[in-house]
Amino acid sequence: MQSIPIKNVGTDNISQLIDRFERQYVYLRLSITDVCNFRCNYCLPDGYKPPSHKQQFLSVSEIQRVVRAFADLGTEKVRITGGEPTLRKDFLEIAHTVSQTNGIKKVALTTNGYRMERDIDLWQQAGITDINVSVDSLDTRQFQLITGENKLQSILKGIDRAFEIGYRKIKVNAVLMKQYTAPELDKFLVWIKDKPIQMRFIELMETGEMDSFFQAQHLSGQSVMQRLLQEGWQLQPKALSDGPAKVLSHPDYQGEIGLIMPYEKNFCASCNRLRVSALGKLHLCLFGEEGIDLRDLLSEDTQQAQLEARLKAALQGKREHHYLHIGDSGIRNNLASIGG
């Protein structure tokens, strides 16, 4: 299989977040809520169900402290995730706070697009530099069948508006499923031919609540990869702060294709990201442990040195790879709880 070159990208600070396997971490995925208003059949088919005990999500000041600590340790990119992060009433304040943190160069947002048409201008003003939005189908009825919401046309208008106000590229996520997404591949290719969209197909991942759905719908991204390579698409080099997608481009297309294939051998070798949940727990892997509590060190600015020390110490416990290939998805019942 064709290998992907990785660009040697310099940084202003040398990251101190380096694990036992010499992987460097410059990318934080920060969940600010686990609430989601969609009912996607691959994630929350029965909708969001609040826990019996009340949860207090990270406050703006706690978010400021955790992002500052990561930035001080070399993190350059923060992705704000959920659940659906834009459901928080203080989302714009959070985005602005993250964007104003010294050392943070990119503030990305992962969203279901529910409020994109209405609020995209405000997101940009708050400091959101990059957007990933989910579009699992370009067919209105199919989209509603997958997500439980009749919002496709509004989301597409939101994407168009993003280009109008100066976003140079939008990343669009679709979960790769035999019955739903795979038959629409040609339609997606037509859509991105003249639009600077990176269309990212994410392999369906097995989680505790979705075993039977996974067995029925899982499709390897390699099948898509081989087809694209045969049609003249070419793999592109990756920058240090890039996510896990293998990106392909074609001279006849303005858009790109990204493939996220967690079951592929060596998927974890280039891991560059850590996760903090909306409840203030550090997760070293999407499919991993219960999480390491950080919240007791987020109350005061004077705790930053202790917080950074805990982050560095915890990182040494990060495993070399996940165990998805043997059916072990860790404790993860669904991906909404930590933002994927």
From Swiss-Prot:
Q: What is its EC number?
A: 4.1.99.22
> Which positions bind S-adenosyl-L-methionine?
Y42, G83, S134, M205
The GO biological-process annotations, alphabetized, read as: Mo-molybdopterin cofactor biosynthetic process
**Reaction catalysed?**
GTP + AH2 + S-adenosyl-L-methionine = (8S)-3',8-cyclo-7,8-dihydroguanosine 5'-triphosphate + 5'-deoxyadenosine + L-methionine + A + H(+)
UniProt cofactor note: Binds 2 [4Fe-4S] clusters. Binds 1 [4Fe-4S] cluster coordinated with 3 cysteines and an exchangeable S-adenosyl-L-methionine and 1 [4Fe-4S] cluster coordinated with 3 cysteines and the GTP-derived substrate.
Radical SAM core domain residues are 20-246
Q: Which cofactor does it need?
A: [4Fe-4S] cluster
What is this protein called in UniProt? GTP 3',8-cyclase
Native organism: Actinobacillus pleuropneumoniae serotype 3 (strain JL03)
Instruction: Give the classification, highest ranks.
Output: Bacteria, Pseudomonadati, Pseudomonadota, Gammaproteobacteria, Pasteurellales
